[in-house]
Amino acid sequence: MLKLTLALAALALAASCSQEPSAPKRNPRLPEPSALAATMQAMTADMEALKIKAQAGTLTLSDVESLRMAHESIKTDQPTKPEDIKESFPGFAEAYLANLDNLYEAIKNQGDVEAQIEAFNAVISTCESCHQQHCPGPLERIGGIKAAALVP
């Protein structure tokens, strides 16, 4: 009987270890993020991923085009709390997209790495400026996305 119990326990352990890990579960008490929050989460992840490319000077036109298309909805996405959005928000959204266009131009004009870093950081500075007025919570994380300037 003991051998049977041990065999079943070993089998159960082996079966549980071979299963694929489940996706992290959301806290059911937290509401789904608004469209604007989801876009900004994607923006953060995208810019964090491109920081290394910016520092290496290996950003491509395709990288920036993809960002521009993915983030265009920032102008129309609904916020979590519409009453917290100030009149200045649309201007910041437009400035963010314009700075992505400037980054695109810096790459297109085959600007040196320093010019690409400067244009990349201008995009991030737009995010910082907006968050100083609208939602200061992620400011530290946003500041950490800036690419380090080249040391002469």
Predicted regions and their residues:
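C-terminal motif of bacterial Sec signal peptides marking the signal peptidase cleavage site
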Residues: 14-16
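Bacterial N-terminal signal peptides that target proteins for export
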Residues: 1-7
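Sequence context surrounding c-type heme c attachment/ligation sites in exported
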Residues: 18-152
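Active-site-proximal loop/hinge segments that shape catalytic or ion-binding/gating pockets
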Residues: 10
